């Protein structure tokens, strides 16, 4: 049986920190699905159709990474995708507190789904999508935070 993992998020935008988590997870899994959650109630800064090719360009030489969009529960998407693992990056203890409770809820929804926590690389730990959106909104240079040009 292949080890398939999903790395879910809004990825608004997909950062160098996200890319680092995916690349570091590749030796652990046969396939990693970057799962972009499409929440109709959440106003995105960058449109999903704009972000998908940007993310795909980061992994164009990697054959075991896919980018998919999903609606609904992450645990259900994992099950539908045949994924047994869910990857989450942790920058700090605040992230852990939040992600731990989400992990427990996902386990309740699907008992076979295991969450794998990966500590963010120290040089990227300060990067967040919301920080990038704030800087970009005021025409600041965000090139050092993103693995692609916007």
UniProtKB/Swiss-Prot annotation:
Gene3D superfamilies: HUPs (3.40.50.620). The keyword Transmembrane helix does not apply. One of its GO terms (cellular component) is cytoplasm. Reversibly transfers an adenylyl group from ATP to 4'-phosphopantetheine, yielding dephospho-CoA (dPCoA) and pyrophosphate. The keyword Signal does not apply. GO terms for biological process: coenzyme A biosynthetic process. It is an enzyme of class 2 (transferase). Its EC number is 2.7.7.3. Belongs to the bacterial CoaD family. GO terms for molecular function: ATP binding; pantetheine-phosphate adenylyltransferase activity. It catalyses: (R)-4'-phosphopantetheine + ATP + H(+) = 3'-dephospho-CoA + diphosphate. It comes from the Bacteria. It comes from Cytophaga hutchinsonii (strain ATCC 33406 / DSM 1761 / CIP 103989 / NBRC 15051 / NCIMB 9469 / D465). It is found in: Cytoplasm. This is Phosphopantetheine adenylyltransferase. Substrate binds at residues 10, 42, 74, 88. The record marks 18 as: Transition state stabilizer. Homohexamer. SUPFAM superfamilies: Nucleotidylyl transferase. Its cofactor is Mg(2+).
């Amino acid at each position: 049986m292949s080890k398939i993992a999903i790395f879910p998020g809004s990825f608004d935008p997909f950062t160098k920190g996200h890319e680092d988590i995916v690349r570091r997870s590749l030796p652990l899994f046969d396939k990693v699905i970057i799962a972009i959650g499409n929440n109709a109630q959440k106003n995105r800064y960058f449109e999903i159709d704009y972000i998908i090719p940007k993310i795909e360009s980061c992994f164009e030489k990697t054959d075991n990474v896919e980018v998919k969009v999903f609606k609904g529960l992450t645990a259900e998407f994992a099950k539908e995708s045949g994924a047994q693992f869910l990857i989450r990056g942790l920058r700090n203890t605040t992230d852990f507190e939040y992600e731990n409770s989400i992990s427990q809820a996902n386990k309740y929804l699907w008992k076979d789904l295991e969450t794998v926590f990966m500590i963010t690389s120290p040089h990227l730990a300060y990067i967040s999508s919301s920080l990038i959106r704030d800087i970009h909104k005021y025409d600041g240079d965000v090139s050092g935070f993103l693995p692609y040009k916007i």
